[in-house]
């Protein structure tokens, strides 16, 4: 492996870290932003929804439209757009301009992860491809563990705008790394056409998986979007303590993601998803009652982190399995559309959570989120029964996992 290859992966990983931080840090800043811009918590929560919609549009649509653009040029342009979006957020005079900033960065996010995996595998030997993708996506996990609590801490002490300025600085570093270390000549796979995307969306069994994904994440983010508000307004944690709790949550997420992947490998995606969705619904329901006690809510947040993102490997494995059965010519497209489904779920969950907060109160978000996750569990059981009817086993062997 040449000296330049790990540096190219480092640039991609740093980009993933910056993007992961800007996506999730907003959750810890919602109370601060709402107070500073004089908007309601649900309005601040829409900043999560609109970012996710940007990702959902960016992943399939912009990836198809930019298929002929050289990969390095596109990567640099994406990091430039991402940096500009965060600078707009830093300078945002009001709520409307902050919305524009979130949509811009969301669009960059969607395409970055669509092409990032391709670039990562292009700069290493074929037998190192999976490891290269894993290294790049480590940036997302590290963002949850360190970037989000650190960004929340910065926002609470220096103002929320300072957080976006710090993320913009990371974007500049990632942009320079891409310019310097990512090779200019990279193989280009055939661009996914809109026809291929529509062919995937015409398959009921794939739509079923996308619904599982959207409902599973929608239920999670219905409550998670307002977690910082719950911790401050209901549990009584100080703003500083919320940063520490989010750090603990991020560590738990990292562990849960590994656990979820191993469970899907051992038992197959449907049994793993059934267990994880069931536990997730239970933990969200428990949060409704434990939020009033700081020690109990801390334990509940730990449990929530362990299961909230543990479904990602199983869902991605499963959508690839189903694509190989029904649209083998468009497996990559099917996997990419599942990323869009994740973010549609996030957008709808955050929006619905805002309606719940507005109309019946903050502490109704966990149990309503649990009901949405139970709907995902029901669809998972249905899909598993259809597989058994078709004589399909639940093994996950031989499937490469992409991630959020």
Regions found by a protein language model. Give the residues of each.
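Helix-breaking motifs and short loop linkers at transmembrane-helix boundaries and internal kinks
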Residues: 38, 70, 91-97, 236, ...
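Intracellular juxtamembrane helix-capping segments at the cytosolic ends
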Residues: 112-124, 310-326
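Paired small-residue
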Residues: 10, 81-88, 96-105, 295-303
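A late C-terminal transmembrane helix in Major Facilitator Superfamily
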Residues: 322-360
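C-terminal membrane-cytosol helix-exit motif in multi-pass small-molecule transporters
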Residues: 168-188, 380-383
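Helix-to-loop junctions at the C-terminal end of transmembrane segments
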Residues: 59-71, 256-268, 357
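Conserved MFS/SLC helix-loop-helix module at the cytosolic interface between two early adjacent transmembrane helices
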Residues: 57-96
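Cytoplasmic helix-loop-helix junction between adjacent transmembrane helices
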Residues: 95, 101-140
